[in-house]
Structures are given as structure tokens and as C-alpha cells.
Amino acid sequence: MSSTPVLAPVPGRALPLSEVPDPVFSQGMVGYGAAVDPPRQVVDAIAPVSGKILKLLPHAYVIMTAEGLGVLVHLGLDTVGLDGAGFTTHVAQGDAVTAGQPVITYDVPAIVAAGLSPVVPVVVMDERDPANITVGTAVGSGSDIDVGATLFTANKQ
């Protein structure tokens, strides 16, 4: 079994996915993982794993690891409707990235001003078994997590 640490892409309060106010994430429809409620300031969202940028949108990105793990970072909820406002990308789709590398600058105050939730779900795409995700202690306690700290570990058979 391989284990991949998945880093917090932004600082803030670590949350279990069940507390994300969107059933697509809270019910594990796209996969399992955890989330971060960021501070109300502009932050750089980093790559939570090393790999290739498989998909890059202004408000979300998917990184595929060498082991075939697809990790989605979604900056805020319902932010697709902002057409990129509040987000500045620093990489291109297809780029190789290293865990900890800045991917998108996220203007959290702009998202809040638009009346949207700034919560950042981080999920292993297509993971159907929550037992394969081991959340970090910050997630279980709802405490603050630093950017780049381990948010959860993805275990793959």
C-alpha cells in the first residue's frame, strides 16, 4: 500500500468534508478528503502534492501524482460563476509542480464580498472508500492548520 501526504493548500481552520456546506463535497460525491476555511485575506493556494496539473481553472485545479492519484483543490464554493474574478493563476495546465509550489493566488475577501463561501475542499478524485483517507489531527479537532502542513494522507492499495 502506498501513502501520499496531501498538504493544506491554504492556511486556516481544518474541517472534515462533512462540514462543507455543499453536498457535492460533504457527501463525497467527487471523492474524499478534507477542507480548509481560509483567513479573510489574500492567500497563495499551493500544490498539495507533487505531480502534473491535469486540469486548471481559475477557481480549481487537479494534480495527478506519479502514482496516479488525482487531487482536486476547489477554491471556494460556487466560485465558477465569478469567471476568474478573485483568482490569479501562476502555472499552466500540463505543468509539473512540486508540493508547496504556489498555483493560484486566492482573493478570499473578494469571494466573501460576493456572498460566497471561501471554504477550500481538497479531495482525492474518484476515491469511493473514506477508509482510504486518514485525516490529520487538525481536521479532527477543527483547529488551525498552516499552509503546507499535512491535511490528510491518501492510502492506495
What function would you assign to each model-found segment?
Residues 1-157:
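Contiguous, well-folded functional domains in the mature portion of proteins
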